[in-house]
């Protein structure tokens, strides 16, 4: 493979790994997040209601937009949709760490799932068109998707680091001018909550993407079809 093919495979592998990273994040942070935001952990009627909502609503939103992912990749291009979907779920995870209420957390978890589902469709389409040879295509898809299993390990490690070192991290706060828009401030006693840092670590996949993105070409198959009308 040439350098461009390697770069595309690297981005796809990072995307697949952090798909699982973002999805498995919720079970790790749910109990402390619910306890802080609504005062009711899972196991109480109110806690169980929001427990279900935080799984059901994002999954539903991701499923709907995942179905639209094929249309978006055909309409806008594989590279553009892949890039923006990764940025969407990475930034959504980061912003979820600033949640001041349960509705804000639900919204950003939903946009995280939307980004994950659309990214998966775009990445598979891009890889399939990058390797016209069936044997190479199968290997590329298999090896890059295998990185999904690493996502679960990474998020467990990130959550462990957040729990152990949260008090040493910068305090999480919301600028005063944004507090009326976002529904209030983060109380000082909650400014070092590990669950917030775990969510914010979801920004990580955006960093290599911003470096590599200028060197990534559009799918030649899609470009030819687009040119042909």
Residue positions per predicted region:
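Transmembrane-helix signature of 12-pass secondary carriers
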Residues: 1-229
């Amino acid at each position: 493979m040439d350098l461009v093919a390697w770069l595309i495979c690297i981005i796809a592998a990072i995307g697949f790994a952090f798909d699982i990273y973002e999805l498995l994040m919720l079970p790790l942070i749910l109990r402390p997040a619910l306890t802080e935001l609504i005062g009711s952990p899972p196991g109480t009627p109110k806690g169980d209601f929001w427990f279900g909502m935080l799984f059901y609503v994002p999954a539903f939103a991701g499923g709907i937009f995942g179905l639209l992912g094929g249309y978006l990749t055909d309409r806008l291009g594989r590279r553009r949709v892949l890039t923006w979907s990764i940025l969407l779920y990475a930034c959504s995870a980061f912003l979820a760490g600033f949640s001041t209420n349960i509705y804000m957390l639900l919204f950003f978890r939903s946009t995280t799932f939307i980004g994950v589902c659309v990214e998966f469709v775009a990445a598979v389409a891009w890889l399939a068109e990058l390797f016209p040879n069936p044997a190479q295509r199968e290997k590329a898809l298999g090896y890059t998707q295998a990185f999904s299993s690493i996502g679960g390990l990474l998020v467990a490690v990130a959550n462990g680091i957040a729990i152990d070192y949260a008090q040493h991290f910068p305090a999480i706060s919301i600028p005063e001018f944004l507090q009326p828009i976002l529904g209030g401030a983060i109380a000082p006693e909650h400014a070092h909550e590990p669950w917030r840092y775990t969510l914010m670590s979801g920004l990580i996949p955006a960093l290599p993407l911003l470096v590599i993105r200028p060197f990534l070409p559009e799918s030649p198959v899609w470009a030819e079809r687009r040119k042909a009308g």
